[in-house]
C-alpha cells in the first residue's frame, strides 16, 4: 500500500470549508425572485409581510412569536424580565410607527401582519392588542381605559356610549349638573347638621345630670341604712351590758346566803 496523500486530504478539507461558508452566507440572505431581498435578521425585526409587484405573498418566519414565547424570555431574574419586556414593547411600538409612515417603498407593497401574529402573546400582561380594545397600560394596577372612535363622537353617539359604559356613567354630561349641589342645598344641609349636633349635645347633658342625681340619691340612702344599723347594734350592746350587771348582783346575793348558812 502506498502512502496517504496529504495533498488530497488538505484539498478535501479546504473544499469542505468553502462549502460550509457558502451555506452560511446563503442562510443569512433570503432570495426573492432571484434578487437578494433581506437578511434573516431584518426579516425577524420587520413588522410587515412584503408583497411583490405581482402581489405574490412572500413567506416570512414567525421569529417574533418564537422570541415572544421562548422559555428563555421568561427568566427568573427580575432585571432580565424587565429588559425583555421593554425590548418586546419597543418592537411593537416600531410596528405601530411604521404603520403610520407613507407606504411607498420602491414599488413594493407593505402590508401589516395579521392581528394574531402582530399580537405577541395572548396571555401576556403587556399585550398591545386585546379583544376589549384596551391599550397597553404602564401601571398594571390602573383600570383600563376604553377609547371611542371619532366617527361615533361625530355622529353624536358619545352620550349613548357614556350611558352604557359603567366606567363613565358618573361623568356623563347629563348627570353632571345633577351631581353638583347648589349653594342653597349646601346651606340647608349645613344648618340641619348643626341642629342635629346641638340636639345630641343637649341629650348627652340631660343624661349626665340624671346619672349624677341618681348617684347622689343612692349615696344618701346607703348612709341612712348604715346609721340605722349602727344604732340598732348600740342598743343591743347596752341591753346585754345591763343584763350582765343584773346577773352579777344575783350571784353576789347567792354567795352571801351560802356563806351565812355555812357559818
UniProtKB/Swiss-Prot annotation:
Parts forming coiled coils: none
Lineage top rank: taxon: Eukaryota
Keywords tagged on the record: Amidation, Cleavage on pair of basic residues, Hormone, Neuropeptide, Secreted, Signal
Residue stretch(es) of the prosequence: 30-85, 102-140, 154-195
Modified residues (Lysine amide): 233
Signal peptide range: 1-29
Listed transmembrane segments: none
Entry comment describing in which tissues the protein is expressed: Bag cell neurons.
Subcellular location: Secreted
Secreted recorded as keyword: yes
GO molecular function: hormone activity
Cross-referenced InterPro entries: ELH
GO biological process, one term: neuropeptide signaling pathway
Positions of the UniProt region annotated as Disordered: 154-180
GO terms for cellular component: extracellular region
Family: Belongs to the molluscan ELH family.
Protein task: ELH acts as a neurotransmitter locally, upon neurons of the abdominal ganglion and as a hormone by diffusing into the circulating hemolymph and modulating the activity of other organs. It specifically causes contraction of smooth muscle in the ovotestis and expulsion of the egg string.
Protein name: ELH type 1
Biological source species: Aplysia parvula (Dwarf sea hare)
Gene: ELH1
Amino acid at each position: 500500500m502506498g502512502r496517504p496523500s496529504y495533498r488530497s486530504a488538505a484539498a478535501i478539507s479546504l473544499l469542505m470549508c468553502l462549502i460550509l461558508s457558502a451555506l452560511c452566507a446563503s442562510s443569512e440572505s433570503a432570495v426573492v425572485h432571484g434578487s437578494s431581498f433581506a437578511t434573516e435578521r431584518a426579516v425577524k425585526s420587520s413588522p410587515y409581510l412584503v408583497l411583490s409587484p405581482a402581489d405574490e405573498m412572500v413567506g416570512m418566519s414567525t421569529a417574533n412569536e418564537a422570541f415572544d414565547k421562548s422559555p428563555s424570555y421568561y427568566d427568573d431574574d427580575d432585571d432580565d424580565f424587565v429588559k425583555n419586556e421593554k425590548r418586546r414593547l419597543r418592537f411593537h411600538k416600531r410596528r405601530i410607527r411604521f404603520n403610520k409612515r407613507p407606504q411607498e417603498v420602491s414599488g413594493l407593497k407593505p402590508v401589516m401582519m395579521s392581528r394574531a401574529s402582530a399580537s405577541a402573546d395572548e396571555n401576556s400582561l403587556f399585550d398591545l392588542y386585546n379583544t376589549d380594545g384596551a391599550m397597553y397600560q404602564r401601571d398594571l394596577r390602573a383600570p383600563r381605559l376604553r377609547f371611542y372612535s371619532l366617527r361615533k363622537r361625530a355622529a353624536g353617539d358619545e352620550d349613548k356610549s357614556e350611558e352604557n359604559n359603567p366606567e363613565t356613567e358618573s361623568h356623563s354630561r347629563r348627570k353632571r349638573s345633577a351631581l353638583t349641589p347648589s349653594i342653597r342645598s349646601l346651606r340647608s344641609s349645613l344648618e340641619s347638621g348643626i341642629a342635629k349636633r346641638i340636639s345630641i349635645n343637649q341629650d348627652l347633658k340631660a343624661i349626665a345630670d340624671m346619672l349624677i342625681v341618681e348617684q347622689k340619691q343612692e349615696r344618701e340612702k346607703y348612709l341612712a341604712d348604715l346609721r340605722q344599723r349602727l344604732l340598732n347594734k348600740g342598743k343591743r350592746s347596752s341591753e346585754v351590758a345591763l343584763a350582765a350587771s343584773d346577773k352579777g348582783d344575783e350571784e353576789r346575793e347567792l354567795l352571801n346566803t351560802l356563806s351565812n348558812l355555812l357559818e
